[in-house]
Amino acid sequence: MASYPGPGKSKAKYPFKKRAGLQASAAAPEARSGLGASPLQSARSLPGNAPCLKHFPLDLRTSMDGKCKEIAEELFSRSLAESELRSAPYEFPEESPIEQLEERRQRLERQISQDVKLEPDILLRAKQDFLKTDSDSDLQLYKEQGEGQGDRGLWERDVVLEREFQRVIISGEEKCGVPFTDLLDAAKSVVRALFIREKYMALSLQSFCPTTRRYLQQLAEKPLETRTYEQSPDTPVSADAPVHPPALEQHPYEHCEPSAMPGDLGLGLRMVRGVVHVYTRRDPDEHCPEVELPYPDLQEFVADVNVLMALIINGPIKSFCYRRLQYLSSKFQMHVLLNEMKELAAQKKVPHRDFYNIRKVDTHIHASSCMNQKHLLRFIKRAMKRHLEEIVHVEQGREQTLREVFESMNLTAYDLSVDTLDVHADRNTFHRFDKFNAKYNPIGESVLREIFIKTDNKISGKYFAHIIKEVMADLEESKYQNAELRLSIYGRSRDEWDKLARWAVNHKVHSPNVRWLVQVPRLFDVYRTKGQLANFQEMLENIFLPLFEATVHPASHPELHLFLEHVDGFDSVDDESKPENHVFNLESPLPEAWVEEDNPPYAYYLYYTFANMAMLNHLRRQRGFHTFVLRPHCGEAGPIHHLVSAFMLAENISHGLLLRKAPVLQYLYYLAQIGIAMSPLSNNSLFLSYHRNPLPEYLSRGLMVSLSTDDPLQFHFTKEPLMEEYSIATQVWKLSSCDMCELARNSVLMSGFSHKVKSHWLGPNYTKEGPEGNDIRRTNVPDIRVGYRYETLCQELALITQAVQSEMLETIPEEVGIVMSPGP
């Protein structure tokens, strides 16, 4: 059995050309206090230079390579033409659909079965010409593994686990069910797509599935670098450590004095072509050397998008991925039939651990709607009783008290009810995102939204801070429920970040059960129409320059520096179903030239968010600060290329509904184990009926999915919306206890909580692959389930990587048997 390098054993280089690392100017003596052993030095470069990402570790050319640009342009133009239609633009013409391929294969097999009675040689010729899956060109590695290994099981290193549950092993030839030429072409395309994602994740210091990386290492000319994305705790967590992390000794927003902040690097900042560049002097001129930080090259990004767009509509590749997904679904059903009782028995053996007593993270929830409607109603009534004379609003230059605001609406506390509040989504919001957005206004009045659920208002967000702290108190009381709340930055002015940070610090809005994500609504067209922005680059400057300033000189933004340590990353939000009038390509205007009132396309927002985040992450990593990830809303509606952009650039996504109609992308998301936070109740009110939601299908196939609430104010009724989400899903889809605990474990793995916190919640070995990384005493997920997921993923990765390797190996005699079960 072949051996594979374990995670963390190889120390190697990036698979792309890396720009020079962070260096400091000798003219900036302050830098020494910030970077310690990694001083900054000047390095001459031109603004806009980027690392070369064009070199794959091996030859992955396919038959589509010369046509990628033309295919992608055709798809993008079709997307624009069909944006008015409800049908999605990824439903392509019937040039090579799966049904035709299936019918053709069945006809051939029927013909073979009829002719073999008359002429046995026909069968042999047919196998050689059409079903030549595992013969001449098959894998030398299979040959080495095949003899004597198939009957002994898959995993020699874990004999105990092997005896614990039953497996289904597919042996013999033609296991993937497609012609070998199609298998080879599909495998090369899939591997190429995975390499594309790996290089962008490495470029931005985001995480990449270690199991997938380990298999890609077999194909790389040089081993891929294994990176640690979270700072390890000073003291490792022991195996017997308590499930609850130790309480903080002091509030994290204490010591906000500038004198207590890290030193000033004395670097200059300027945005060039939509990306912030860092210079060695505070006021850079044309000849000032630049501190070189890596960011993606625009030309290569567009080329990579074209490759993936061409890949997802290739007929043979669609057939291959569709078959693999169907196989994964069937295999899971067989696993459940064989091992369900063993999984349940393993859970029952664990003392004081059940679904209620394991950590769950709401990985997709908006802060402005994190409370339920009854909670908001009670808070408004309480405010009307206690703060009736407080000045809360300014209307046309005149200050108004809370009493005057409600008198202008002809309302009293007695008149208010849940029905009057009218914030809950109903049947009228289905496919009407505009009506859904209106539900954010209590009683249909935007002034109440501004007073009660905004951070920037006349009272500096006092009411909103109080209600958020009440939600946090409920989470802390439950002990095992956590949330990642989204706060908004719009990019209309440079001081938005400081106002948001002051709101959090001054009101001490913090909880060990809560992390923050910052969402950026894609509303440039609205701001441009109102004359609030001159061009798109101004919006990018308002979003990212304060973050770079707080990193270079934390004392200049003390509250922001403290706040950013509790921010996980960035989210991109808006109605994805809105038509896009532009295609992002090399002819698209640069951000400083985007002055029209049309909104840039989704990929445009995502690319420039990613590029600036990548630069910022490298700067912050050198200073020892917390880094960020990209976790956008994606795949809820709209065109398929949203999911293509997210596959390349995002660590996790929210929604992902459209993957159900894109088998190639769904298979890629599975192989890369990209987290998908799904909200079935939210989707049920907006885009997709509950019974049609693909979550149970994704879960059975092994995609990294979790349950989330999205907007409890609009969609939920109880005090514990996350438990409500789990309970409804369990009842409707008949999920088992193991399924529910697996979803909860996935939510913790996907979340942005620190490595130390996750070590307490999941166990100190949670970063290890397979059952070794599972602690059933903390997760209540049986090793049987984790082992099944791990083995299945390894087998799928082995199928595609070994098919690619087969081209580089000598011909294998046809009579040699083949076993497709590599060791870990």
UniProtKB/Swiss-Prot annotation:
Binds 1 zinc ion per subunit. Disruption phenotype: Mice have normal brain histology. The active site is at H655. It holds the Pfam family AMP_deaminase. GO terms for biological process: AMP metabolic process; ATP metabolic process; cholesterol homeostasis; cyclic purine nucleotide metabolic process; energy homeostasis; GMP salvage; GTP metabolic process; IMP biosynthetic process. One of its GO terms (molecular function) is metal ion binding. The modification Phosphothreonine is found at T133. It catalyses: AMP + H2O + H(+) = IMP + NH4(+). SUPFAM superfamilies: Metallo-dependent hydrolases. Pathway: Purine metabolism; IMP biosynthesis via salvage pathway; IMP from AMP: step 1/1. InterPro entries: A/AMP_deam_AS, AMPD, Metal_Hydrolase. The modification Phosphoserine is found at S45, S63, S79, S96, S113, S135, S137. Gene3D superfamilies: 4.10.800.20, Metal-dependent hydrolases. The modification Phosphotyrosine is found at Y90. Its cofactor is Zn(2+). Zn(2+) binds at H364, H366, H633, D710. AMP deaminase plays a critical role in energy metabolism. Catalyzes the deamination of AMP to IMP and plays an important role in the purine nucleotide cycle. This is AMP deaminase 2. It comes from Mus musculus. The lineage of its organism: Eukaryota, Metazoa, Chordata, Craniata, Vertebrata.
